[in-house]
Amino acid sequence: MVCIVSAYYKIPSKKPHEWYLPYLVRWFRAAASNTVPTHFFTTEDVRQELASLTDISRVQFHILPFEELTAAELGREFWELQYARDPERYHSPETGMVWYEKRHFVRRAIEMEPDINVFIWCDAGCIRNDACEEVAKKLGQRFVQYEAGRMYFQCIQEPAQKQFYQYPDECIAAGLFAGDRAAWKDFIALYEATLFEYTIAGFSATKEQNVMASCVFKKPNLFVLWTQEGKVDRTWFKFLELL
């Protein structure tokens, strides 16, 4: 069995909250037509706003204040440092915190779902058009031959063989990724260690795509890099129609 996990927080981000709302509505419309168990982490005000816009009844909500995220345990100064080192200035410290937290949202869902083996992270803002919305209705129902103990990443281009990645490197698309319980456990531990290696080396760890690429460099056998293109979305969100 498969589980979908996502989250959304109203924070300083690349785009204003109003820009994301239509895509959030699309996400929940697709979820309403899906049969895969789905967990969503957010705040109560966001839940109420979404409930006023679309049907959210099939999704299991978890109200988790932003200040209670695992990312907050690293301290505000840690995320301010990542932002200060980040050449892409539209990434706020809060954005870095949510990107980091994706793995811990999944960790929480894993703890809640002892009978489910495969977990898919799916960004709440990744459904941008009608075609993506349609294929997302079957997310988690197509691909069943997950290799035990391996994470599945969307590969934009084969990562160069190096320890650290920074702008303009683009190797891994982080809107959707998946794996079984064992793979997630190993990936979370590897990501944590790699995050601090970035910090010690003087690189920004804000952008999860870069840290994920470094994880692939360090432990390639943990990952399946999916290069196949989608028909609806060819790159960043192709797992919407492939998983």
Language-model features: where?
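Short, acidic, metal-binding catalytic loop of nucleotide-sugar glycosyltransferases
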Residues: 21-37, 52-56
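Short internal beta-strands
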Residues: 39-43
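GT-A fold catalytic core of metal-dependent nucleotide-sugar glycosyltransferases
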Residues: 100-152
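N-proximal low-complexity "stem/linker" segments adjacent to membrane-targeting elements
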Residues: 1-23
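Short, charged/polar "capping" segments at the starts of alpha-helices
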Residues: 44-51, 161
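Short beta-strand-to-loop element that shapes/binds the nucleotide-sugar donor at the catalytic cleft/hinge
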Residues: 149-164
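Active-site-proximal specificity loops/subdomain of glycosyltransferases
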Residues: 55-113
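Catalytic core and acceptor-binding pocket of nucleotide-sugar-dependent glycosyltransferases
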Residues: 128-131, 166-243
